[in-house]
């Protein structure tokens, strides 16, 4: 829901009411003649347990919880006499050391009058108090706050702040101060005394001139690493450290806050405002920082403007240097109250921030920052990070106090801000959806295991019933009789006699003891007598099985049988279990039977569904053999109870449930309530403190019997929801069932879920939070990882780190690595830290080098990248990436790793990379089609560069690329005979490329043959890469491609050449070689060729100006070469 759909409302708290005596006191304070009341707007408050109201010279206090059995009678206590207005800020109600009639702490109360007269009740039930006149130097008390609860005979301690800014510590006086309530007052910190007498003497006799400060309007304490007290006055904001104790820092409004307020006015007026005045109103802690409410005025406005500023958490340790965030508070309603000529608005505004709102990192699901006035309340909704706000404006909402009502007080609790009004009672200030009705009261029926305690008078009845159970279900052998008597003696608290009776059994092997105990317990839970009430019988079984567990534990039998193998026959099938499973099964079978009985008797629909279920259960062969016909008789056979949920789940089959929608949903709800009831009762039994804790073994009895039907029902619910025939209310109800039902299935399963299908379906149905809760609870790592991969980086990584710690024993870290690698999320995998992840990445070189770079292990990364580049035979782009990164890492290595091998590898393979990049796309498409990223060997590059091209220019460039490649390789391997042979073969291919029978003269060699054009290219063409001003192939490198023996090359040529052709070819090669020798002697600057298209506008102009000079320089260079050539000729 967006902020536009929210409205601020006064939500009535119906559970809190004013007692009759309090209402009478309100009436007594009403003056009919003047049509006004003496009740002030700061005379009432409350906390989590109590409410209190000041009325004239007394205080009323009563419990918040409304009792339906009796009227609320408040406690009345007398207040100290005062000539100044009282305030609940000087009242503290806390949990005292005394206990009331219901064993709960009886509240203590501390009241301080404005003049400093203290009254302290350690218990309101005693009505006795201690009164002391505090030495506060004639200052006026402003606020009292509790600092320490009473403990070890010491009274509670308090902090008292005066309107002059002085802080006093009130702590217990005497060794028994917790009972007497005696307190002593000590000044802790504050300004120099500014009491009434001091100010009067200063006026009469003069004194040292000091800058005066205004009176404190509010103060509060904040516990962080230190106990801080913040005092707010219109002109100064001060923070004291109580542990030092001293003033931590102080900020003057005029110097620190007023310039910020002036900037708002300047933005409005578009010029510098005149006579700007700012006044601090209130402050509160918000997101560890300090939120401050400020009022501001200027000359051209007749209103008081409201502003909020926020300072970061550094305020708790040092003086702030600036404001982090600030905003205007638009007070558009009740504008008459904000007149500049009326200063009362400053004292009638209160900043209220509940604890949960203050600690929340975002505004969602909070009521915002609330400002209260006797006539209205506003909320500022700040849905952004104050340090880095993304939205320029905050949400503002307003609500008016009912016009005929009167504000009595307010209270800031953990979740809400409460206001107490004369007529309307107590309400919370809530930011709710627009048009939202009064909150409905939802009650959650909890399944509670009944008490297992039995009084002395009850045991004879249980003992008689136990004898019937043993007699009907067990043979009369000495062992069973001894176990029976021993348990009877234990129940009657004759422990020694019980142990003596048990000696014969103790001497038996553990497995035999487990067998006897198992048969004894099953005789109890499978006992049934039609003369007994079902619920009474179930309660007896519950008590007896619980007490037997205690009996086994006390007698040392429990530890012996808990791991003993045990065979239990059910329906003719032998199930192998251990003693611990058997003990848990017995208790939980009784609990499940109780849950089924409770469900069956709750309403008629459930009873009808139960009848349909029992009819099918009675036809099961195992049940038929017992001859049971009474539908309720099965409750006496707890050993068969697992058939009921299984058959109940079958009732949801399409061919059983029926086509009528209303009937179908009735059966759905009935079955789901049954399964949920069984689940809740079993879980409650496992958590019950009155039973012996039994460890849950991997294969539990529920998994072997009926747990799978819970998954079946969950899948049927999902199928029903997908059909879309259910209403919104039915859909919500079914979703609630599926959470409970599937939670039980997962808890009983012996395998850890992984990407569970039902959980994925729940996410798709709009229950991701609940699905994640189940996935986290039952360690479905696949679902957890899959879901959080869709969140932002911060949330995802924070959650993964939390899971690594939470599931350390389950090795979530390695699961995460495998999942991310398997699903191609290498980006997330590389964000994981730790030595185990490093070891994992060592198995994957393509990931390992990234981690090594991140850890600044550049030497290791270079070696890894080199091996990857050497092994890459398919993708040229990957080869380039690996080779380039290997070189850069090697150059950056400072960890002592020997990277000479990497540098040598780069030197050898760099020519291949460089020349593969220069092969035109047209040639690559001919070679590989659309696979332009294919790797090419040196032979492939030579072959395709020398292939027949569409024109002579392309052919020349192809041979140039081939010779350039060979030249670069020969520079790396100068002694390679194989490269020299390839150079000769390339010259042979160049000569054979032409039809020499068409060449008639030496001039034709230059103009008509590829050989001649290539020779001309060697001495006259020096192209450069785009953006480079120097040629890609310099003369000194071009000299390397000359054949070692031109005669041999020409002899091997297949061209139809004559003697003249051969002499022309040799002459050409000789002339080119001489020209290249001369060019090689020239400096590199002689080949500078600026790219006129790749420079900026200023450089362009400069180069255009020098263009003619550079052209003349180039021409002189060419003329010089021609003259030298003519002279040699």
Swiss-Prot record:
InterPro entries: Nucleoporin_Nup133/Nup155_N (IPR014908), Nup133-like (IPR037624), WD40/YVTN_repeat-like_dom_sf (IPR015943). It comes from Caenorhabditis elegans. One of its GO terms (molecular function) is structural constituent of nuclear pore. Disulfide bonds: none annotated. Important for early nematode development. One of its GO terms (cellular component) is nuclear membrane. GO terms for biological process: poly(A)+ mRNA export from nucleus; protein import into nucleus; transcription-dependent tethering of RNA polymerase II gene DNA at nuclear periphery. Belongs to the nucleoporin Nup133 family. Keywords: Developmental protein, mRNA transport, Nuclear pore complex, Nucleus, Protein transport, Translocation, Transport. The keyword Endoplasmic reticulum does not apply. It holds the Pfam family Nucleoporin_N. It is found in: Nucleus envelope; Nucleus, Nuclear pore complex. This is Nuclear pore complex protein 15. PANTHER family: NUCLEAR PORE COMPLEX PROTEIN NUP133. Its main location: nucleus. It comes from the Eukaryota.
């Amino acid at each position: 829901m967006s902020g536009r759909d929210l409205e601020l409302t006064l939500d009535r708290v119906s559970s809190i009411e004013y007692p009759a005596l309090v209402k009478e006191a309100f009436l007594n304070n009403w003056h009919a003649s003047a049509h006004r009341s003496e009740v002030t707007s700061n005379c009432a408050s409350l906390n989590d347990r109590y409410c209190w109201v000041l009325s004239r010279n007394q205080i009323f206090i009563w419990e918040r919880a409304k009792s339906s059995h009796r009227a609320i009678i408040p406690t009345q206590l007398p207040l100290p006499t005062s000539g100044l207005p009282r305030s609940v800020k000087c009242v503290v109600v806390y949990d005292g050391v005394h206990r009331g009639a219901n064993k709960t702490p009886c509240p203590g109360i501390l009241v301080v009058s404005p003049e400093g007269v203290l009254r302290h009740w350690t218990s309101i039930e005693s009505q006795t108090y201690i009164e002391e006149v505090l030495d506060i130097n004639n200052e006026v008390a402003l606020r009292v706050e509790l600092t320490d609860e009473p403990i070890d005979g010491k009274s509670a301690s308090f902090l008292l702040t005066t309107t002059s800014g002085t802080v006093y510590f009130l702590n217990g006086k005497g060794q028994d101060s917790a009972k007497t309530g005696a307190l002593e007052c000590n000044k802790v910190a504050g300004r120099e005394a500014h009491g009434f007498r001091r100010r009067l003497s200063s006026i009469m006799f003069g004194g040292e001139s000091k800058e005066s400060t205004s009176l404190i309007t509010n103060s509060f304490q904040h516990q962080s690493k230190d106990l801080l007290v913040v005092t707010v006055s219109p002109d100064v904001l001060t923070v004291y450290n109580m542990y030092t104790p001293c003033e931590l820092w102080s900020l003057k409004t005029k110097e620190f806050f007023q310039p910020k307020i002036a900037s708002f006015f300047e933005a409005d007026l578009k010029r510098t405002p005149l006579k700007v005045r700012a006044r601090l109103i209130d402050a509160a802690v918000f997101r560890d920082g300090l939120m401050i409410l400020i009022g501001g005025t200027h000359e051209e406005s007749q209103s008081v403007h409201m502003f909020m500023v926020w300072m970061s958490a550094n305020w708790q340790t040092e003086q702030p240097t600036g404001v982090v965030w600030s905003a205007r508070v638009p007070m558009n309603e009740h504008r008459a109250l904000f007149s500049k000529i009326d200063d009362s608005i400053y004292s009638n505004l209160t900043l209220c921030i509940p604890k949960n709102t203050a600690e929340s990192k975002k505004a969602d699901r909070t009521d915002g920052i609330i400002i209260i006035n006797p006539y209205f309340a506003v909320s500022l909704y700040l849905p952004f990070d104050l340090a880095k706000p993304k939205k320029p404006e905050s949400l503002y909402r307003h609500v008016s106090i009912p016009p005929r009502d009167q504000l009595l007080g307010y209270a800031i609790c953990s979740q809400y801000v409460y206001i107490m009004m004369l007529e309307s009672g107590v309400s919370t200030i809530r930011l709710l959806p627009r048009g939202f009705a009064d909150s409905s009261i939802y009650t959650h029926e909890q399944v509670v295991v009944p008490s297992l305690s039995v009084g002395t008078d009850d045991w004879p009845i249980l003992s008689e019933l136990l004898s019937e159970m043993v007699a009907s279900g067990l043979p009369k052998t000495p062992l069973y009789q001894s176990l029976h008597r021993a348990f009877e003696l234990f129940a009657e608290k004759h422990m020694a006699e019980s142990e003596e009776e048990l000696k014969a059994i103790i001497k038996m092997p553990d497995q035999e003891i487990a067998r006897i105990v198992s048969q004894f317990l099953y005789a109890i839970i499978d006992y049934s007598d039609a003369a007994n009430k079902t619920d009474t019988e179930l309660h007896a079984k519950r008590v007896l099985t619980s007490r037997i567990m205690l009996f086994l534990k006390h007698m040392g039998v429990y530890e012996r049988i808990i791991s003993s193998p045990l065979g239990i026959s059910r329906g003719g099938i032998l199930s192998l279990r251990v003693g611990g499973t058997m003990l848990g099964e017995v208790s939980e079978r009784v609990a499940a039977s109780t849950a089924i009985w409770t469900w069956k008797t709750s309403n008629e629909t459930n009873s009808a569904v139960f009848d349909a279920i029992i009819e099918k259960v009675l036809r099961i062969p195992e049940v038929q053999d017992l001859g049971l016909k009474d539908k309720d008789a099965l409750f006496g056979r707890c050993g068969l109870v697992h058939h009921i949920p299984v058959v109940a789940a079958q009732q949801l089959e399409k061919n059983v449930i029926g086509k009528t929608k209303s009937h179908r949903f009735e059966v759905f709800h009935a079955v789901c309530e049954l399964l949920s009831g069984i689940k809740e009762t079993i879980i409650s039994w496992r958590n019950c403190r009155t039973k012996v804790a039994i460890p849950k073994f991997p294969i539990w009895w529920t998994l072997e019997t009926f747990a799978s039907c819970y998954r079946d029902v969950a899948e049927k619910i999902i199928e029903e929801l997908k059909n879309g025939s259910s209403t919104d209310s039915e859909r919500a109800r079914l979703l609630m069932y599926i959470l409970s039902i599937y939670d039980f299935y997962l808890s009983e399963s012996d395998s850890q879920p992984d990407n569970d299908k039902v959980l994925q379906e729940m996410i798709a149905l709009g229950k991701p939070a609940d699905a994640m809760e189940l996935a986290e609870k039952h360690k479905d790592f696949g679902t957890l990882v899959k879901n959080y991969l869709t969140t932002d980086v911060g949330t995802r990584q924070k959650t993964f780190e939390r899971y690594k710690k939470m599931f350390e024993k389950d090795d979530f870290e390695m699961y995460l690595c495998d999942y991310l690698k398997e699903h191609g999320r290498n980006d997330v995998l590389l964000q994981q830290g730790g030595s185990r992840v490093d070891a994992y990445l060592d198995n994957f070189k393509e990931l390992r080098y990234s981690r090594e770079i991140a850890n600044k292990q550049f030497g290791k990364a270079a070696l890894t990248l080199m091996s990857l580049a050497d092994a890459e035979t398919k993708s040229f782009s990957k080869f380039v990436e690996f080779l380039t990164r290997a070189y850069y890492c090697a150059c950056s290595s400072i960890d002592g790793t020997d990277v000479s091998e990497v540098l040598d590898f780069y030197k050898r393979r760099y020519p291949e990379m460089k020349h593969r990049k220069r092969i035109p796309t047209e040639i690559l498409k001919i070679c590989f089609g659309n696979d332009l990223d294919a790797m090419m060997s040196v032979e492939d590059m030579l072959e395709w560069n020398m292939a027949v091209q569409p024109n002579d220019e392309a052919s020349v460039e192809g041979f140039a690329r081939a010779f350039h490649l060979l030249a670069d390789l020969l520079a790396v391997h100068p002694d390679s005979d194989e490269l020299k042979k390839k150079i000769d073969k390339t010259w042979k291919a160049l000569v054979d490329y032409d039809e020499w029978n068409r060449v008639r003269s030496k001039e034709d060699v230059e103009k008509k043959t590829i050989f001649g054009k290539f020779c001309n290219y060697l001495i006259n063409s020096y192209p450069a890469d785009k953006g480079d001003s120097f040629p890609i192939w310099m003369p000194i490198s071009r000299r390397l491609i000359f054949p070692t023996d031109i005669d041999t090359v020409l002899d091997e040529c297949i061209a139809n050449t004559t003697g003249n052709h051969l002499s022309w070819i040799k002459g050409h090669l000789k002339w080119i070689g001489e020209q290249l020798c001369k060019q090689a002697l020239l400096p590199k600057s002689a080949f500078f060729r600026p790219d006129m298209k790749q420079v900026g506008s200023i450089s362009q102009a400069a180069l255009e100006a020098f263009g003619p000079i550079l052209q003349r320089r180039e021409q002189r260079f060419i003329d010089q070469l021609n003259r030298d050539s003519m002279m040699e000729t």
